[in-house]
Design a protein with these regions (language model features):
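Amphipathic alpha-helical interface elements
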Residues: 1-182
Length: 184
């Protein structure tokens, strides 16, 4: 990262973060086609940096501090990616946003400038996201099926009712066991 200019650094950190959040969400979500479609592909509802930040925070996958840092990075990224003008991380509004970032929790040296601050802060954050994603997988902390079916009221002949209920129970059992197999 040290060889990148300011724009390259910001865009790279944002792209790495967006990708890491997408992987975190996929690791956490049920392992099915619908989950992948939420994250990947054209017009995916959770395909943007902003939506991934909000989804991870609302699901409890990132802390409030991490959420705030990612939102700051997103705002800084937008300034660099939506402008052809010569802008800098030393510009007053961008500099204030960088100063508002949390300090790296794995580096004991105080950053010398805004370039080092954002690089170290977001690099630390990316490591934390990677570790959390790994722990979700290792400790089987994936989302679990909580939906259920309800059998209310009966009509028709007794034998038909019993057979219908048995089919429903078997279907529920299959739903639950197929999900359990995916998390092992």
């Amino acid at each position: 990262l040290d060889s990148l200019d300011e724009r390259g650094l910001i865009l790279s950190l944002a792209a790495f973060s967006e990708d890491a959040l997408g992987k975190m969400l996929l690791t956490f979500m049920l392992d099915n086609k619908a989950s992948k479609e939420l994250i990947e592909g054209f017009n995916a509802p959770l395909g943007t940096f902003s939506s991934r930040i909000k989804a991870c925070f609302s699901l409890g996958l990132i802390t409030e501090g991490q959420y705030k840092d990612l939102e700051l990075l997103r705002k800084i990224r937008n300034k660099f990616s939506h402008s052809w003008e010569n802008i800098s991380i030393e510009d007053q509004d961008i500099s204030q946003q960088i100063k508002a970032l949390s300090f790296s929790r794995i580096d004991f040296e105080c950053p010398k400038d805004n370039y080092q601050k954002i690089k170290k802060s977001i690099s630390c954050l990316l490591i934390e996201i990677k570790i959390t994603t790994s722990q979700i997988k290792k400790k089987h902390l994936k989302a679990r099926l909580v939906g259920s079916n309800v059998n209310i009221g009966f009509s028709g002949k007794y034998e038909e009712q019993v057979n219908d209920i048995k089919k429903n129970i078997e279907s529920i059992k299959n739903d639950l066991t197929s999900h359990d197999k995916n998390i092992k």
